[in-house]
Amino acid sequence: MADQLIRATAADGGIRAVGVISTRLTEEARVRHKLSYVATAALGRAMTSGLLLASSMKREGSRVNIRIKGDGPLGGLLVDAGLDGTVRGYVGNPSVELPPNAKGKLDVGGAVGRDGYLYVVRDVGYGYPYSSTVELVSGEVGDDVAHYLITSEQTPSALLVGVFVDVTGVIASGGILLQVMPKAARDEELVSTLESRVGQLTGFTPLLRAGKTLPEIFEQLLGDLGLVILPEIQMVRFDCHCSFERVLGALKMLGEAELQDMIEKDDGAEATCQFCGEVYQASREHLTQLIEDLRAQSG
């Protein structure tokens, strides 16, 4: 199944639902960053969460940054997701590996750490990003993002994200976000019903591995609540904005002395993008041209 995002409503618009399949993009991140099993699960959950959060934004070019800094050996992670369906991200320690947790699953909470903070920055394109910080509740990513939605945005929310990875790579990755909108938030029975149904699920990836599609998952959860699945299917993908031109721009900011030192010591420069792992090589000729440009600007 292709990576995709779909939206739906239920209860006469009182419930907003979003679902994401992110298997291929999580696999691309795993390969690019050479991620361990648990690092793959952590970053995959975070990238899926980023896409789910970005899906509610309205203005073209809007993006969401999720940064998690816990006390675990993963060393934190950072995700950048857009309303356009693009996402990228990285972890501090891609090779970290831990024994399974008490449930026999990948110990994402242990890798991330249970003491720390989740930082969310929403950039809606007006030049004034909105930022919020909440304490981690479990380090499992999904619980922490749901906690952010409830405490910072005061929106009753259920968020379920998951990644299944084995020796062959990422087999399944994705998630769903259910939110009770303000006009229905006082309906305690509706909120309780949603919590109960989501709580009965054993996870998100088992549904995908069983062959369930996103519409079928929504039907299972919301079918008797006036479910309306919106017709648009949005493709989502791992995508980075880095380029050789940006690398040259960053090198130029180092100044003439530093560039000259690179030429003399290394005969060039190498830069690696943290978000996607792409390696860029700037030759002696490139650096010499940057120095000439700087001299021309100062002259």
From Swiss-Prot:
Asked if the Swiss-Prot or TrEMBL record annotates the protein with the keyword Zinc, the reply is yes
Q: Name one cellular component (GO) term.
A: cytoplasm
Q: Which GO BP terms apply? A: protein refolding
Q: How is it modified post-translationally?
A: Under oxidizing conditions two disulfide bonds are formed involving the reactive cysteines. Under reducing conditions zinc is bound to the reactive cysteines and the protein is inactive.
Give the disulfide map: 240-242, 273-276
Report the locations given in the UniProt record.
Cytoplasm
**Pfam families per the UniProt record, alphabetical:** HSP33 (PF01430)
Q: Per the record's keyword annotation, is Disulfide bond included, yes or no? A: yes
Q: Which UniProt keywords apply?
A: Chaperone, Cytoplasm, Disulfide bond, Redox-active center, Zinc
The domain of life is Bacteria
* Single annotated GO MF: protein folding chaperone
Q: What does this protein do?
A: Redox regulated molecular chaperone. Protects both thermally unfolding and oxidatively damaged proteins from irreversible aggregation. Plays an important role in the bacterial defense system toward oxidative stress.
The UniProt entry's sequence similarity note says: Belongs to the HSP33 family.
The record, for HAMAP family, names: HslO (MF_00117)
This chain belongs to the protein called: 33 kDa chaperonin
What is the originating organism of this protein? Gloeothece citriformis (strain PCC 7424) (Cyanothece sp. (strain PCC 7424))
